[in-house]
């Protein structure tokens, strides 16, 4: 009986590596998810209706739902206080004559703590032309240089962004700065007066640094990075 087991054991040893190789694939998004603290802003029925109407006016679709996001937009708050930014997003104030007020899905504090403010199934008004398909990440700070030079904030931001890439299949080329939105192939704005509006936070040069680091972190975590940036002429 013992002699009969020897060929069987040898066969299993030969089969095991091939089976293991077949099982290798992208990591489970939960395996790369960083620690996130929930600190929800009010986003009840009224704000959802406002977001749905905003979407109808600007994107031609009456919904507040964010489905299959294709882009991550990086921002900074142009301030030094987490509480000030959170309160501004929570207030749901009128912006450019319209509601809902501005917000972002995530807000990263200066100590590197990641706060989630809004459910990822809900559209947030954080970047003109992009809210229909983009997740917004805000960083507490007054310049991209300061954030890029802050180890705690960068570690948190890169891990968060890589997790979102893994979860939604977003390519590294569609991780963009607010200042790059007009050249994104996903930019869509029905209001002519708004079509060329954007902000200056995280410009092309700053995002080259960010994306270079992002690829390194994604590589270490075995997260597929997809295609690089594909810019379009906005005509602006």
Predicted regions and their residues:
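N-terminal catalytic cores of peptidoglycan-degrading enzymes
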Residues: 20-128, 235
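Soluble periplasmic/extracytoplasmic beta-strand elements of cell-envelope proteins
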Residues: 73, 105, 136-138, 176
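Solvent-exposed, acidic/flexible segments
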Residues: 67, 99, 130, 146-154
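Substrate-binding clefts and substrate-entry loops adjacent to catalytic sites
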Residues: 121, 136-149
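A structural motif
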Residues: 129-136, 206
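Bacterial N-terminal signal peptides
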Residues: 7-16
């Amino acid at each position: 009986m013992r002699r009969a087991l020897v060929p069987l054991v040898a066969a299993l040893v030969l089969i095991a590596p091939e089976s293991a190789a077949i099982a290798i694939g992208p990591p489970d998004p939960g395996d790369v998810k960083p620690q996130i603290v929930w600190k929800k802003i009010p986003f009840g029925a009224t704000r959802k209706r406002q977001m749905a109407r905003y979407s109808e006016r600007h994107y031609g679709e009456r919904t507040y739902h964010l489905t299959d996001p294709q882009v991550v937009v990086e921002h900074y708050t142009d301030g030094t206080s987490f509480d000030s930014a959170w309160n501004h997003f929570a207030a749901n104030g009128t912006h450019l004559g319209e509601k809902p007020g501005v917000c972002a899905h995530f807000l990263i504090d200066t100590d590197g703590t990641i706060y989630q403010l809004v459910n990822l199934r809900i559209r947030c008004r954080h970047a003109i032309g992009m809210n229909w398909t983009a997740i917004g990440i805000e960083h507490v700070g007054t310049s991209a240089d300061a954030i890029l030079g802050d180890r705690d904030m960068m570690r948190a931001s890169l891990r968060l962004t890589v997790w979102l890439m893994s979860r939604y299949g977003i390519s590294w080329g569609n991780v963009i700065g607010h200042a790059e939105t007009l050249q994104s192939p996903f930019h869509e704005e029905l209001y002519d007066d708004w079509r060329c509006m954007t902000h200056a936070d995280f410009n092309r040069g700053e995002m080259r640094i960010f994306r270079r680091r992002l690829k390194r972190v994604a590589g270490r975590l075995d997260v597929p990075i997809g295609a690089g940036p594909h810019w379009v002429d906005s005509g602006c």
